[in-house]
A protein has these predicted regions:
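Acidic, glycine-rich A-domain
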Residues: 1-137
């Protein structure tokens, strides 16, 4: 695919205030090619010396693209990217608001690595839970 978009919402050096504004301004952009984005994020985070590396994915939970990146192929690609990230010390956690995502999220991200949200308003709480789980105690 010639056009795979990747957006960084917060860098390591900026304050959360700026990132919150970008998060609030997010809009759907069509197509959800999750696997390549996860591989890119994994590569970027693998270059850091951070003790913990976490990728938070906000998705409709349906990997798809115009070139048949969907169904079993898309799900398997995302699963492979998640497993590869974990092997490199990068943790992936997904958030989806679409009710139908319940069918795909467990297959792609694995048990305990996703939140299925009923409404966008519940995202801040779910984000906090996911980050807190990475920092027990």
């Amino acid at each position: 695919r010639l056009d795979c978009r990747f957006e960084i919402l917060k860098t390591f050096t900026e304050e959360w205030t700026d990132a919150r504004h970008r998060l609030a301004d997010l809009q759907p952009r069509g197509y959800t090619r999750i696997g390549p984005a996860l591989r890119h994020a994994t590569e970027l985070l693998s270059r850091t010396d951070a003790r913990r590396r976490l990728v938070l994915v906000l998705t409709d939970g349906k990997p798809n693209d115009y070139d048949r990146y969907e169904g079993r192929h898309g799900i398997a690609d995302v699963r492979r990217a998640v497993l590869d990230a974990e092997a490199r010390g990068v943790h992936i956690h997904a958030f989806a608001i679409d009710h139908d995502a319940r069918f795909h999220l467990p297959q792609m991200f694995g048990r305990g690595r996703f939140h299925l949200l009923r409404h966008p308003r519940s995202l801040p709480r779910a984000l906090g839970e996911a980050v807190a789980a990475m920092h027990p105690g």
